[in-house]
């Protein structure tokens, strides 16, 4: 069902962007597993059957959940101020998914992005956001740099997951 790449030792490659990084991509967000998977378009098969990168994420908490559905990436910003009833923060590498829901790096309490919450960072993989899809800054930057406006994003639960779990950053 999926085209996969393996290392010389036979283990599955989790990030194949160095050898296969097509311009046309498709993204899934699995709310249950806290995983983002990016697929590349395979012109030989005419489908998005090549998983090229996997990321750990936090989606909305039970009060401000991330809505399931199919969306298109909108605008993108290097940094955006976020506001809620009880918070103001700045998020790096913001890519709009729908309305005020974005892919973005773990937010900072300061505009220079030098102070991120250890709780937020260490909670990646669990539903903790205010509805956005929260990523490491490295992964949010990858989406910002490699995914164009108009790319399809599917958000759901228990989605097919062809890769092993991504490694947590420490």
Provide a role label for each language-model segment.
Residues 2-12:
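A general sequence property marking short-to-moderate contiguous segments
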Residues 10-114:
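Gly/Pro-biased beta-strand-loop elements
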Residues 48, 65-68, 80-170:
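Exported/periplasmic cell-wall-interacting domains
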């Amino acid at each position: 069902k999926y085209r996969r790449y393996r290392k010389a030792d036979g283990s599955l490659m989790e990030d194949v962007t160095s050898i296969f990084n097509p311009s046309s991509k498709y993204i899934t967000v699995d709310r249950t597993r806290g995983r983002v998977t990016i697929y590349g378009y395979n012109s030989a098969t005419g489908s998005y059957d090549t998983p090229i990168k996997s990321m750990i994420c936090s989606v909305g908490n039970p009060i401000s959940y991330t809505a399931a559905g199919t969306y298109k990436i909108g605008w993108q910003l290097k940094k955006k101020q976020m506001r809620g009833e009880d918070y103001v923060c700045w998020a790096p590498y913001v890519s709009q998914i729908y309305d005020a829901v974005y892919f973005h790096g773990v937010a900072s309490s300061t505009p220079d992005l030098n102070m991120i919450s250890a709780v937020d960072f260490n909670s990646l993989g669990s539903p903790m956001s205010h509805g956005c899809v929260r990523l490491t800054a490295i992964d949010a930057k990858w989406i910002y740099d490699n995914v164009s406006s108009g790319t399809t994003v599917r958000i759901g639960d228990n989605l097919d997951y062809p890769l092993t779990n991504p490694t947590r950053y420490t």
